[in-house]
Regions:
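Extracellular/periplasmic carbohydrate-active domains that bind, remodel
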Residues: 1-444
Length: 444
């Protein structure tokens, strides 16, 4: 069955709310057993919408869904999952199946309404405490997201929580690069996922695989995911696994991706008890440049870290990870950190060609193990451990200088590190503050 939204006589002017009409169309589709709802060209101002099973929401070229600038307009799409203090979504479904979002149209998130107009001295635009996520699907299966564009999200853009059989193809996310915590695509405790040919650009993580805290019935492992032929851009980490890791993350394959104009390239960060196993990155190009100090990372092309967040929760190990045919340029170093020692193990690098280049940031020559690092708030989240300044160093807690200067690869507390056919190109003569040793390995 196919329905035309035009038959519901929407205002389509971008000013008059069309929420009730679009929800009615979705409900009518559901009552008929499902099908496709075609949203024709026009600008539709909307609050929260609930998506039913067996639904294809098709946005025609020229169609623009505009998320309301008022958080109260999402009260009826309150989510079970919470991201920071965000418990509402623009497009929402829970325990539904066979949902498709597709078409050449776009979704606009009205992000400016939820952020301060100007960044502070750390480069941080202060967000409102309550901001809607754009797409939140919880405990759903048979999900397809294809061809749509999402712009200017005020919070996490696409958050798939405990979903199975997910296919994301040719998704474009283009968020404001001054707005933190606007992750492009978050795969949270999802299983059997394919992400292919997407372009994801955000100030926060472009693509993040995680296992957040959630009710036990929804707390699955994240496993069996394939990511390929994507272009990723981020002021934080272009392709991140973690930091929220309350369940294991296993069997991931990432290949033929370009990580460009990003602060940190690939990040694996374990904090909350879940282990990482059997992960492979291959045929990836990176370009890492130093971002403003509020963002985690110092232009590291590859970053692996295990450390405690909550002193009562032992962090999970990171093991059986391979990096093969990684090439590119960076202003920082490869960083591998395990605290306690030995929680990062069996890490293999093969056919790596990286060029390290000088930058103009005063932060070059530092490394960053956030979060958490603020001793006054050891279990804190968000701003507590994002960018509070250590009065002893004048830098954010967790941002430290390399012993003896910046190398090309810095490893501390790693067991079973294998380096095969690595080419690390560095300027000659070395800039002031760079270590003459390209590779530094410390026991702890």
């Amino acid at each position: 069955m196919t329905l035309s939204f035009r038959t519901y006589q929407p205002a389509a002017d971008g000013i008059t709310p069309d929420t009730a009409r679009l929800q009615q169309a979705l409900d009518d589709l559901d009552a008929q057993g499902g099908g496709t709802l075609v949203v024709e060209s026009g600008r539709y101002l909307l609050g929260g919408l609930r998506l039913p099973s067996n639904c294809c929401l098709q946005l025609d070229e020229g169609a623009e869904l505009i998320a309301s600038a008022c958080y109260d307009d999402f009260a009826h799409t309150t989510t079970l999952s919470v991201a920071e203090l965000s418990d509402r979504a623009f497009l929402y479904a829970r325990q539904q199946r066979n949902i498709t979002l597709c078409g050449k149209g776009k979704i606009t998130g009205s992000a400016d309404a939820y952020f301060s107009a100007q960044p502070d001295e750390q480069g941080y635009r202060l967000p409102a405490q309550h901001r809607p996520r754009i797409v939140v699907l919880e405990d759903c299966e048979q999900i397809t997201i294809q061809d749509i564009t999402i712009e200017h999200a005020p919070m996490w853009t696409v958050h798939l929580v405990s979903c199975r059989q997910v296919n994301v193809e040719r998704l474009t996310v283009d968020n404001d690069m001054t707005m933190a915590n606007t992750d492009a695509l978050n795969l949270d405790s999802c299983q059997d996922v394919i992400v292919h040919d997407c372009h994801l650009s955000a100030a926060d993580d472009a693509l993040c695989i995680k296992t957040t805290a959630k009710p036990p019935a929804m707390q699955y492992k994240a496993q069996r995911m394939s990511v390929s032929h994507c272009r990723l851009r981020s002021r934080s980490c272009a392709l991140k696994i973690g930091t929220e890791t309350f369940a294991d993350i296993e069997d991931l394959n990432v290949s033929h991706c370009t990580l460009y104009d990003s602060n940190r390239g690939i990040g694996l960060i374990s904090r909350d008890g879940g282990a990482f196993r059997r992960i492979c990155f291959s045929d990836i190009t990176v370009e890492c440049v130093t971002a403003p100090p509020c963002h985690w990372g110092k232009a590291d092309p590859i970053f692996i870290s295990v450390r405690y967040r909550d002193p009562t929760i032992e962090p999970g190990v990171i093991e059986q990870v391979r990096f093969v045919r990684i090439t590119g340029v960076s202003e920082g170093a490869i960083n591998l950190h395990s605290t306690p020692a030995g929680y990062v193990r069996d890490i293999h690098f093969e056919d790596i060609t990286l060029t390290q280049q000088p930058g103009d940031s005063t932060e070059q020559g530092l490394y960053d193990v956030r979060p958490p690092c603020n001793p006054a708030r050891p279990t804190g989240m968000g701003l507590d451990n994002a960018y509070l300044v250590n009065p002893d160093t004048g830098r954010a807690y967790g941002v430290e200088a390399y012993p003896g200067g910046m190398p090309a690869l810095f490893a501390r507390g790693i067991n079973g590190l294998t380096l095969h056919n690595m080419t690390l190109q560095r300027p000659s003569p070395l800039p002031v503050g760079w270590n003459h040793d390209a590779i530094i390995e410390l026991a702890e």
